[in-house]
A protein has these predicted regions:
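Aromatic (often tryptophan-rich) hydrophobic motifs at membrane interfaces
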Residues: 1-89
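In a subset of proteins, long, contiguous C-terminal domains/tails are tracked
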Residues: 79, 84-116
């Protein structure tokens, strides 16, 4: 693999924020995911003077690396209208659980939130 690309991460830059969205690899290496998706993104933000890095939704491993759990939104296209009501009910119920999980996950950050 020497000198060959074995992984890539896709980032988008908008305003003062870098957004990490997708990644893939051809071979597995310890910590490659973190290097490609987080550490290189952080380094780019510092070099480019960006004030925010949004590494994407999900992934409890992000909390250990100091990424605060934040709410995000998604859109769903439901082809068969018969599922619309069931999906809407589930989404409404899930909302409370997601908010509770966000608060619980924030307690796992390697630093304290709020003013000193």
């Amino acid at each position: 693999c020497a000198g060959e690309a074995v992984a890539a991460a896709l980032f988008f830059e908008g305003g003062d924020t870098l957004y990490g969205r997708y990644w893939g690899c051809l071979a597995e290496f310890d910590y490659l995911h973190f290097e490609a998706c987080y550490y290189r993104g952080i380094e780019y933000c510092i070099d480019a003077g960006l004030s925010r890095f949004d590494p994407g939704a999900q992934g409890e491993h992000k909390i250990q690396r100091g990424f605060e759990p934040v709410l995000t939104y998604s859109n769903h296209w439901i082809v068969d209208e018969r599922f619309s009501d069931a999906v809407a009910r589930f989404a409404a119920q899930e909302c409370d659980h997601v908010r509770a999980y966000q608060q619980e996950a924030a307690t796992l950050l390697p630093f304290k939130l709020g003013s000193p």
